[in-house]
Amino acid sequence: MGILARDGCELTPRAEEAEVLVVNTCSFIEAAQKESVDAILEMAEHKKFGAAKKLIVAGCLVERYREQILEQVPEVDAVVGTGEVERILEAVHGDLRMLPAEPPTFLYHDFTPRMVTTPKHTAYIKIAEGCDHPCTFCIIPELRGKFRSRRFESVVREAENLAAAGAREITLIGQDTTSYGEDLGLRDGLAQLLAKLAQVRDLLWVRFLYAYPNRITQELLDTIAAHPRLANYIDMPLQHASRKVLARMKRGANGDAFLDLLERMRKTIPGVSLRTSFIVGFPGETEADFRELCDFVKAAKLDWMGVFEYSDVDHAKSYALDEKVDAETIADRRDRLMALQKRISKESLRAKYRRVKNETFLALVEGPSKENPMVWEARLEGMAPEIDGKLYLTDIELPGGDVAEAGDAVRVEITKSEAYDLIGRAVEILPRPAERAVANVPFIAAVPAEGKPHRIATGAPLRVLG
């Protein structure tokens, strides 16, 4: 979207207004693939009966089904794969039907035009692209290519620019953030990067997601513990705890090894919040394997957890494995595991944030709740944006009359804990950073908190649905 906006396109969320429709697709799992296909067909109808003159399909689905998309949906005018992102303008302005396929080697940098689709106080930075791990359930290497890290200085510059534009929190992402820098010859590259980002002024927290268990080093843990701006938070997808299932996944390790790692994390970083995700119903997973996973979850006492139902992806190696688990059993196991974690998360929140007289916690204010505008949402250090629980503030006005705003850092008292969320009230608003000029950024545009893009009025005649 940033490339299009810099070129003078006016972005709109309304398909009926657009002259060019761009569908960015995902095909990582079956559900995402179906959603992408549905979106393409819906936009094809808009093109037939609306103002749109062109329909472009971009993203992961193109990497797998480039020719099929063009053959089966004649309304599609061009396809742009993950290796051709910077050629989106050729697709928009040209009359070519298919760009020549290129290997997925694209890696954006701090000068790449970018539209920030989060509220300005929180932002994501992708520090790497692709993956070299051989997980049998995953097709990321096919879709995104080999692992490649962004240059150290490029990531730091982007963080500095986002902070100058009002970001109080940076979340680092990548298919495997903990491998950052290995291809650049950096030892403990993520630890080095975090230490540098911890010096960026005006940031409240820096966190990272998608850590790979065997890449968690003691140096990384020590770095998190040493810098107050580095959130005491680690997201580490484990996928399972049964040695047999993990071996079939080509993940390695086992539940006991994971428990040892979790103990080391908690010892090094007191109060650390831990998140993971699991896959249930992987081919060959027996009831005994599932019970082993449940026993692990009970012992691990993780703060947050996501559970995914296994689904076959035709290009994944697991597609050819025998002993498939039926859909009903998979859904039942997901429900049972989530019910177990719900009790654990509730106990974890209660223990970490139990009501203690005069004790306060640092929180980042998000804004009014969608469910109830009279209540405001915030997050604590141990809550990552979009995926974890929330802190609901029943009162954002202080006795002196000051009122907290979205993006404010506040001290809060916790009054109640629920299964995944907390309730509290603001008692102090921390000083707000002074506004600063943003340098060396070709395009940064914020969109509303609900995540829908603004129509960007540039005076250009072309409207693009993003």
Give residue ranges: language-model regions.
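Radical SAM/AdoMet-radical enzyme domain recognition
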Residues: 164, 191, 196-200, 205, ...
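Conserved, mostly hydrophobic/aromatic
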Residues: 135, 155, 172, 208, ...
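Conserved glycine-rich "GG(E/T)P / GGGxP" loop and the immediately following alpha-helix
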Residues: 27-32, 167-192, 196, 200, ...
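Residues at or immediately flanking beta-strands
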Residues: 54, 169, 205-207, 233-235, ...
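Proteins enriched for Cys/Gly/acidic motifs involved in redox and nucleic-acid/cofactor modification
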Residues: 1-180, 219, 224, 230, ...
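Terminal RNA-binding accessory module
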Residues: 320-466
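Generic beta-strand/beta-sheet core signal
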Residues: 58, 173-175, 209-211, 237-239, ...
